[in-house]
Amino acid sequence: MKLRWFAFLVVILAGCSSKQDYRNPPWNAEVPVKRAMQWMPISEKAGAAWGVDPHLITAIIAIESGGNPNAVSKSNAIGLMQLKASTSGRDVYRRMGWRGEPTTSELKNPERNISMGAAYLSILENGPLAGIKDPQVMQYALVVSYANGAGALLRTFSSDRKKAIEKINDLDADEFFEHVVDNHPAPQAPRYIWKLQQALDAM
């Protein structure tokens, strides 16, 4: 009986320890933020055009590319804000009334990349995330959706978008973050929020 109880305890502890610590590996925001800040004039211009906080744009640049306009990820996300031509890039083109998707050279252009990144954040805020009332919760929801998709986030609350937004509005920023830690299927989702806060604090 004791052996059976010990085995059960080991399974429980293993389950608890399987949740990744979003703070590991460590991330120092100081250098990437400094590099991202060089693009602030463009971020301010794009932010004004699309109604997006330029500090949020700068934080995303720091997190996504460390301020490198030529960065290309393994999944072919490109440029300062690491946009994928076939997904976020196509969404922005559609929003602008254009056909097709941006080219690699277009996404490596700092002004075009930041403009499209700001446009995509606006699409998220005024589309699937519309109705979130708390500004900080909206900011957290934006970065999680930017990285992992709005649908994946909303489904952790409800399969119905309206009900999901209502549940989100019952939470403050800390409670929203804890919900993401406990329920989002992507382990990088809470880490992205944590990195966002680190980046904003470093500005």
Curated annotation (Swiss-Prot):
It catalyses: Endolytic cleavage of the (1->4)-beta-glycosidic linkage between N-acetylmuramic acid (MurNAc) and N-acetylglucosamine (GlcNAc) residues in peptidoglycan with concomitant formation of a 1,6-anhydrobond in the MurNAc residue. A lipid is attached at C16 (N-palmitoyl cysteine). GO terms for biological process: cell wall macromolecule catabolic process; cell wall organization; peptidoglycan metabolic process. GO terms for cellular component: cell outer membrane. This is Endo-type membrane-bound lytic murein transglycosylase A. Its EC number is 4.2.2.n2. InterPro entries: EmtA (IPR023946), Lysozyme-like_dom_sf (IPR023346), Transglyc_AS (IPR000189), Transglycosylase_SLT_dom_1 (IPR008258). Transmembrane segments: none annotated. GO terms for molecular function: lytic endotransglycosylase activity. Murein-degrading enzyme. May play a role in recycling of muropeptides during cell elongation and/or cell division. Preferentially cleaves at a distance of more than two disaccharide units from the ends of the glycan chain. Residues 1-15 form the signal peptide. A lipid is attached at C16 (S-diacylglycerol cysteine). Keywords: Cell outer membrane, Cell wall biogenesis/degradation, Lipoprotein, Lyase, Membrane, Palmitate, Signal. It is found in: Cell outer membrane. It holds the Pfam family SLT. Belongs to the transglycosylase Slt family. It is a lipid-anchor.
